[in-house]
């Protein structure tokens, strides 16, 4: 299970969601400013920490060895997270994936392989 924090939209009952995936060595803390900067009142923001510790931050996969197993594991964890978001009322058609660096790779990996279409992929 991934560590997450939902920053609710200013508009009550909004079903629009942006899932934010940070880069190597960062964390969700590095993106707390994003909802305020975007100023989109209908947008809920889900900040997500990658699963692996990395020098005080987090990593989505091992950059020094074979990356494939880590990418696959993180993809599966993100699929589970997105399935839970769908169950909680956030349809994938109203969900954006946003990623930077390693988070961008995961955005593309998940966005192109998840069985449901997203509103958009941002990297």
What are these regions (language model features)?
Residues 1-92:
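Serine-hydrolase catalytic machinery in alpha/beta-hydrolase-like enzymes
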Residues 20, 99, 123:
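Conserved SAM-binding loop
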Residues 27, 113-114:
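A short His-aromatic
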Residues 33, 109-113:
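Active-site signature of alpha/beta-hydrolase-fold catalytic machinery across serine-
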Residues 44, 94-96, 120:
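Proline-centered loop/turn at the N-terminus of a beta-strand
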Residues 57-59, 107-110:
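Short, conserved acidic/polar surface loops in the N-terminal third of protein domains
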Residues 98-103, 107:
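Gly/Ala-rich beta-loop-alpha elbow adjacent to hydrolase catalytic centers
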Residues 116-123:
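A conserved short beta-strand
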């Amino acid at each position: 299970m991934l560590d997450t924090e939902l920053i609710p939209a200013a508009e009550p009952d909004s079903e629009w969601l942006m899932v934010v995936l940070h880069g190597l060595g960062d964390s969700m803390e590095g993106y707390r400013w994003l909802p305020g900067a975007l100023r989109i009142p209908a947008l809920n923001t889900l900040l997500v920490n990658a699963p692996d510790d990395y020098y005080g931050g987090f990593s989505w996969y091992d950059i020094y060895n074979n990356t494939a197993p880590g990418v696959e594991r993180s993809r599966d964890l993100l699929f589970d997270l997105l399935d839970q978001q769908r169950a909680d009322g956030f349809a994938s058609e109203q969900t954006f994936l946003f990623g930077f660096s390693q988070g961008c790779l995961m955005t593309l990996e998940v966005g192109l392989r998840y069985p449901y279409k997203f509103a958009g992929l941002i990297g």
